[in-house]
Structures are given as structure tokens and as C-alpha cells.
Amino acid sequence: MPIIKSSRVNIGRFTIGGSIPIVIISIFDHDAKSLTEKFETKKLSDKNLYEIRFDLFDKVNIDEELEIIRALDEMDIDYIFTYRGHDPEKIYETAITKMVPAVDMDLSLLNKVNRRSPDTRIMVSYHTDSSKDMIEKLDEMLKANADIVKVACNYKDEKNFFKDLIEIAQRKEISGKPVLFIPMGKSFLRVISAYYVSDMVYAKYDKETAMGQPDPDYYNKAFSLFNYIG
């Protein structure tokens, strides 16, 4: 699990493409200081892989970004840095210059952010409400200069989800590149995607950063069931 395997890619100590999808805990906070305190007081464990949603912080500027990166580096935290806000090129180039473990950038930014580092994995992503657009973009993304590909779609009709799942599985099997397929809105669809194609899944800490994010325990129980059935 996932059934369709990919080549292996590391984000820090975590290996994508293994036997069980990696659970990413998506987090944000007021500022660097409040985030650091959560790790220091063990509210957040240093054993997990995190998504840092910098655009959702109350304080968003280069100095705050640098302080977050410095603090997480000192505490040896593995994470994916994500920013969906104003002036993204500058924010991402700063993150890559500082060699964060991974960044998640929108497809529209891939050729605008010129900075690259062998220490930073690049995840290219595309979010939409149109499954047709998503599949078309996926073909482009699988050929792009990125380590990991993520597509996310909001579904009103579950039949469209299953149709897309087959399409994505076929493409992943051919390319061998790590793929995340995120069906937004319903948590159980995220689990089904993980069983077949998704090498990583997103969980909430205390608040969702996208529709339908369950907590980590939801995934862990589902994955245990799949292993039992297998």
C-alpha cells in the first residue's frame, strides 16, 4: 500500500515510496515563537513529517520565515514548506536558499522560482474543482522538473473520483514518480486514494488547512485495517 508503487524519494528522514503512505500533519501558528514553543513543550512531536503552511500564519514576512526555518533546523524537524500568498517567488527562493527539506509550490510557479538545491525536494501541485483540468495538468506535471507530484480536486460526485483514480493510477504506474492524489471534501476518499496511489496523505493538527482533512489517528486506524485485510 499504496498498490501502485513509485520510485523512492527522501524528505529528511522520511522515505516516500515505501510500504505505507506517509502521514503529513499540516500546521500553522501565530508566529515562529508560538510554533517553536509547541515543539519545545512536546505538543508537537519531532517524530512526524509536517507541512508548514506559512501563508496561514498571522505574521508573514521574510524575517519570520527565516526564524521558522532556523528554529526547525535547530530542532531537526522534517517538513514541507508551503506558501500560497503574496509574492510567492521571493518566499520560495528564500526557503530553497536555506535548504528546507521540501517545498510544495503551485505548477504556475515552477518555472518562475529559479532557485534549486540538492537538499530541497520539489513538490509541484495543482488544485482545482475540475477533474478534466486536473488530469490534463497531471500529464504536464509528471514530465516537469520536480521530485513529487500532487493533484487535488474537490468532488461533488464520487463517481468522478473513482474515474480519476483509475486515470491517475495508470499514469503513476508508467512514470514511477511519487504522486499524491488528494480528493478534497470527504475524508474516506483520501483513504481510498492512499490505498491505491497516494504516497503521502495530509492530516490536520487542530484545524483543517484543506477540506476533509482527518486527524492522523484516522489514517493510522485505516492503514492498520488494510494491513490486516492484506
From Swiss-Prot:
One GO molecular function term of this record is:
3-dehydroquinate dehydratase activity
Record's InterPro entries? Aldolase_TIM, DHquinase_I, Type-I_3-dehydroquinase
Q: Which UniProt keywords apply?
A: Amino-acid biosynthesis, Aromatic amino acid biosynthesis, Lyase, Schiff base
Q: Which GO terms describe its biological process?
A: 3,4-dihydroxybenzoate biosynthetic process; amino acid biosynthetic process; aromatic amino acid family biosynthetic process; chorismate biosynthetic process
Q: For this protein, what reaction is catalysed?
A: 3-dehydroquinate = 3-dehydroshikimate + H2O
Task: Enumerate the Pfam families for this protein.
Answer: DHquinase_I
Name the Gene3D superfamilies on file.
Answer: Aldolase class I (3.20.20.70)
State the active site.
Answer: 127, 150
Which EC class heads this enzyme's classification?
A: lyase
* CDD domains reported for this sequence: DHQase_I (cd00502)
Q: In which pathway does it act?
A: Metabolic intermediate biosynthesis; chorismate biosynthesis; chorismate from D-erythrose 4-phosphate and phosphoenolpyruvate: step 3/7
EC number(s) recorded for this UniProt protein: 4.2.1.10
Q: Where does this protein hold 3-dehydroquinate?
A: 26, 51-53, 84, 190, 209, 213
Give the function comment from the record.
Answer: Involved in the third step of the chorismate pathway, which leads to the biosynthesis of aromatic amino acids. Catalyzes the cis-dehydration of 3-dehydroquinate (DHQ) and introduces the first double bond of the aromatic ring to yield 3-dehydroshikimate.
Family in the record: Belongs to the type-I 3-dehydroquinase family.
State how it assembles. Homodimer.
User: Which HAMAP family does this entry report, sorted A to Z?
Assistant: AroD (MF_00214)
UniProt protein name: 3-dehydroquinate dehydratase
Which species is this record about? Thermoplasma volcanium (strain ATCC 51530 / DSM 4299 / JCM 9571 / NBRC 15438 / GSS1)
